[in-house]
């Protein structure tokens, strides 16, 4: 069983998506079962995968007790982790490379479908706009929480 016990503790939704995707990709490569923490996940308040996305119905929920952790050693792809990750460990780190999950791309596209309660209001807003809508993403991120200048 491959897990990501601390998913959500290292960042917000984008980081959690990378963590989840990496877990699925490595598990699929080795034929391991995999699981993610349940929605409440020990009180981590920004753990939001469950509330945002229609995650795989095949997922198991829980955390591995008394397990070893596999720590990402740096902020780019690590062949050793992808090619030789042992079973019965929990991943830890950011894992921000598509190479960890390119093998499960189609599954992830399904998993990362927004719940209708999020998607429908967005569709309604887009439909209400005359002309061609333009979307702009402004990343404000963590500095807004600590820097009074925003």
Where are these regions (language model features)?
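Short, flexible coil/turn micro-motifs enriched in small/turn-prone residues
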Residues: 6-9, 88
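Secretory-pathway luminal glycosyltransferase catalytic domains
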Residues: 39-150
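A short, glycine/small-residue-rich beta-strand->loop->alpha-helix junction that serves as a flexible
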Residues: 8-18, 145-147
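Extracellular/lumenal mucin-like low-complexity stalks
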Residues: 1-5
């Amino acid at each position: 069983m491959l897990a990501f016990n601390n998913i959500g503790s290292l960042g917000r939704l984008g980081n959690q998506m990378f963590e989840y995707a990496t877990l699925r990709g490595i598990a699929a490569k080795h034929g391991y079962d995999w699981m993610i923490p349940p929605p409440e996940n020990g009180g981590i308040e920004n753990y939001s995968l469950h509330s945002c996305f229609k995650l795989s119905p095949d997922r198991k929920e829980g955390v591995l007790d008394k397990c070893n952790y596999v720590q990402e050693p740096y902020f780019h792809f690590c062949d050793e982790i992808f090619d030789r990750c042992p079973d019965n460990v929990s991943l830890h780190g950011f894992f921000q490379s598509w190479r960890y999950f390119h093998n499960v791309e189609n599954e992830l596209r399904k998993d990362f479908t927004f719940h209708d309660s999020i998607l429908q209001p967005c569709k309604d807003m887009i439909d209400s706009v005359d002309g061609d809508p333009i979307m702009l993403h402004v990343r404000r991120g963590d500095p807004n929480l600590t820097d009074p200048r925003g």
